[in-house]
Amino acid sequence: MARTTPISRYRNIGISAHIDAGKTTTTERILFYTGVNHKIGEVHDGAATMDWMEQEQERGITITSAATTAFWSGMAKQFEPHRINIIDTPGHVDFTIEVERSMRVLDGAVMVYCAVGGVQPQSETVWRQANKYHVPRIAFVNKMDRMGANFLKVVNQIKTRLGANPVPLQLAIGAEEAFTGIVDLVKMKAINWNEADQGVTFTYEDIPADMVELANEWHQFLVESAAEASEELMDKYLGGETLSEEEIKNALRQRVLNNEIILVTCGSAFKNKGVQAMLDAVIEYLPSPTDVPAIKGILDDGKDTPAERHSDDNEPFAALAFKIATDPFVGNLTFFRVYSGVVNSGDTVLNSVKSARERFGRIVQMHANKREEIKEVRAGDIAAAIGLKDVTTGDTLCDQNAPIILERMEFPEPVISIAVEPKTKADQEKMGLALGRLAKEDPSFRVRTDEESNQTIISGMGELHLEIIVDRMKREFNVEANVGKPQVAYRETIRDTVKDVEGKHAKQSGGRGQYGHVVIDMFPLEPGGEGYTFTNDIKGGVIPGEYIPAVDKGIQEQLKSGPMAGYPVVDLGVRLHFGSYHDVDSSELAFKLAASLAFKEAFKRAKPVLLEPIMKVEVETPEDYMGDVIGDLNRRRGMIEGMEDTATGKTVRAQVPLSEMFGYATDLRSQTQGRASYSMEFLKYAEAPTNVAQAVIEARGK
């Protein structure tokens, strides 16, 4: 099969936004205008096409990032058909893993902002993730028809809050109920969409008289921003020459691809205005797979030799699995992005991360929750495979004769845990299977069995994250579970350096004895660094080399469950510098036990402390409740970092220990009569005050 769409006409984009910016509605409209969807789904009545899990439709928030393919030839059919692969990303902070994961496989992004709420806390998180992966982006300021909508205010917030360089491509004509269309600042024409056909057709008109001055001012700004792309254009512009429409567009595109500017469009997805022009901007300004740098990886040659793959059908096949989803009819769906080469259904490829072969049984192109079976995929494609056996998020699938490992994704450590048990004993096995499958889909979710209590413990990124996991067990696997109280993931560490601490394990009672003797130093390491280091400074063979790994292992086993309260130990180094052994009685086990004794003793002497997770909390509240909100955060041991005005009141930024934040959503609702909202994400570990640490240690000791 030959390629049907040249790779230069591909756009792999993500649509990212804060929870209520109207992202799903925007995606729906894209699907409608690109002719995929014949009836527009509304989130309000739970019918949106992209939100395909039952819970998403109930909660009205997007949880799973679904991938969809659509074609667009421009509002005025001015382009050849372009293929747009859209990844819908969740906007809730508990699902930032999904956002991170999709940013990894995108070439460009559309950031959706609410014209009333502007740049919200979650938008900043998503922005940072897009920066991390150098994703070129444009913005769409949605909900221009809502009370309090203000386009230029949001443009200013993109500058001040995100530290970006926004350049409006358009201006809104009117706002709130009077919002009727937009001014195209490149063409210097007004665009009005036809309401009778839901905005499929439009007319170019003259700019309204009362907007001419403002439009000229912003047109100048736009042209100047374009001219900054090259000295040649700058000279032309400064020399008073007019830049052609093509020159302006090419220059702006160059600057977007270099991440120097963010072009800002506007509209109201709900009122069928603006999404069409935003789609044109996606084609004109966002990158094709050939516009972005080749993907980097390492060769599987034992030396980690750097390598890369270009977006080209003729290069060896390489793809990245970025999401595993469970489908009610076909089982596991593995979403993957093809970076190079071609693969056909029925082909066998290599999972280079696990050194295992996988066969592509069937390949499907997803349209939200509908699917179309296809025979092959090529460089630049995003598709899903059915029947892959052992692929995890972040694995590389590649040509068996040209193995490469593409960059691995980094996943955050969970910060909250709860115990779960099935309501009936019969469901125990089913629950294990369900949790195993959910953990495969979501690397930020972990499952383990507590050795002491034998309870099943699930851990994740926040209360909502775990609530949804429990909910999915019930819906998708028919397992009802009882849930315990949330537990905080504390850590243990030390503050002092101690030297020459001995550990001796000696047993002489008939038969072969056991003998191991070590002397260690222990010292604190920088937080957030390596976590643990082991240095072997044994001189003159006082401990034979074959026992050294056993000493390291003995210490590492102690790190899993610290001496204070059984929490993992972090940020410390151990130096082994002396000891003794016995020709007959010494063994690896004896040295392992000696090391663990030395570790416990050294830890006790080195000023041990308990670390607790601190969350970055942002609360948006009407001004009337400001005092209550701040008072409540202070009571929760919060440290207020600052406040700023928003369109609807104030935003309070604080750092608060996670242990104090349980049930906060309910308390905040009752304090503010449901008018405030908050977002929370993990920030760092910090030393817990003595009284808190004492209470935790006592509770663990019971």
UniProtKB/Swiss-Prot annotation:
Q: Where in the cell is it found?
A: Cytoplasm
One GO molecular-function entry = translation elongation factor activity
Q: Which PROSITE patterns match?
A: G_TR_1, G_TR_2
* Residues reported to bind GTP: 17-24, 88-92, 142-145
* Top-level lineage group: Bacteria
Q: Which InterPro entries match?
A: EFG_II, EFG_III, EFG_III/V, EFG_IV, EFG_V, EFG_V-like, EFTu-like_2, G_TR_CS
Q: Which UniProt keywords are given for this protein, alphabetically ordered?
A: Cytoplasm, Elongation factor, GTP-binding, Nucleotide-binding, Protein biosynthesis
Which Gene Ontology BP annotations are present? ribosome disassembly
One Gene Ontology term, aspect cellular component: cytoplasm
Q: Chief location of this protein? A: cytoplasm
Q: Which residues form the tr-type G domain?
A: 8-290
What family classification does the UniProt entry report for this protein?
Belongs to the TRAFAC class translation factor GTPase superfamily. Classic translation factor GTPase family. EF-G/EF-2 subfamily.
Described function: Catalyzes the GTP-dependent ribosomal translocation step during translation elongation. During this step, the ribosome changes from the pre-translocational (PRE) to the post-translocational (POST) state as the newly formed A-site-bound peptidyl-tRNA and P-site-bound deacylated tRNA move to the P and E sites, respectively. Catalyzes the coordinated movement of the two tRNA molecules, the mRNA and conformational changes in the ribosome.
**PANTHER family hit by this protein:** RIBOSOME-RELEASING FACTOR 2, MITOCHONDRIAL, TRANSLATION ELONGATION FACTOR G-RELATED
What's the name of the protein? Elongation factor G
Gene encoding the protein: fusA
